[in-house]
């Protein structure tokens, strides 16, 4: 069976970037969230989930993001999400007001840049 979702994880300094491609639905949401959370070392400032190339996300994907925000927050780390305007995923995040749980950025550079900059 073909994998619905692609997950690429890399470290950019003190920030972990998880790039998702394909479809994030109930069949892969739980394992995807666990894989991302497990990839964030305690020394990291947090994680950026890049959803720029994600084609589809259902409510289980939204739930996974809220859970991930709580989980990294409990370790005093940050979650940021990349969802460019005009993409279906960006609209879903807007509807559920995900920005109240974690910042949503238009591009990866701004998400990583803001997280890498110490807050006063």
Each language-model region and where it sits:
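Short, solvent-exposed coil/turn elements at secondary-structure transition points
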Residues: 23, 85, 108-110
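A charged, well-structured terminal subsegment
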Residues: 104-120
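Generic N-terminal initiation segments characterized by hydrophobic and/or small/turn-forming residues
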Residues: 1, 17, 21, 51, ...
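Glycine-centered tight turns that cap/initiate beta-strands
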Residues: 14, 98-101, 107
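Amphipathic alpha-helical interaction surfaces in cytosolic regulatory modules
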Residues: 26-102
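STAS-typified acidic loop motif
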Residues: 3-34
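Conserved catalytic submotifs in the C-terminal HATPase_c
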Residues: 12-13, 52, 109
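General small-molecule cofactor/ligand-binding pocket signal
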Residues: 10, 82, 105
